[in-house]
């Protein structure tokens, strides 16, 4: 599945912001705007035993240009919350359910 970072109208959002995938399916996060974005999984809101640092981008790493991507494969079933660290305060958060 492809998830856009930034809506077409320039909004600070993940599109889609709430979605489901099958275990082992790849998620590709793609910068859709000229703003720097990243993808960080919330260590308190992912399945037990999953290491957030192994599935997140480093906090200082940003997708700066439109079209830049970050891909991750989630194999543990459960619900994962994620956010863009520069824009978390603006509500740029999302959730994926792995079935």
From Swiss-Prot:
The UniProt GO MF terms for this protein read:
copper ion binding; electron transporter, transferring electrons from cytochrome b6/f complex of photosystem II activity
Asked if the keyword Membrane belongs to this entry, the reply reads yes
Its needed co-factors are: Cu(2+)
GO cellular component labels: chloroplast thylakoid lumen; chloroplast thylakoid membrane
On whether Repressor is a keyword of this UniProt record, the answer is no
Cellular compartment(s): Plastid, Chloroplast thylakoid membrane
Q: What is any Pfam family matched here?
A: Copper-bind
**Which UniProt keywords are given for this protein, alphabetically ordered?**
Chloroplast, Copper, Electron transport, Membrane, Metal-binding, Plastid, Thylakoid, Transport
Instruction: Determine the domain of life of the protein's source.
Output: Eukaryota
- Using the record's annotation, list all stretches that form the Plastocyanin-like domain: 1-99
What membrane topology does the annotation report for this chain? Peripheral membrane protein
Annotated Cu cation binding sites: 37, 84, 87, 92
> What is the similarity comment for this entry?
Belongs to the plastocyanin family.
- Function description: Participates in electron transfer between P700 and the cytochrome b6-f complex in photosystem I.
Protein name in UniProt? Plastocyanin
Recorded source organism is Solanum crispum
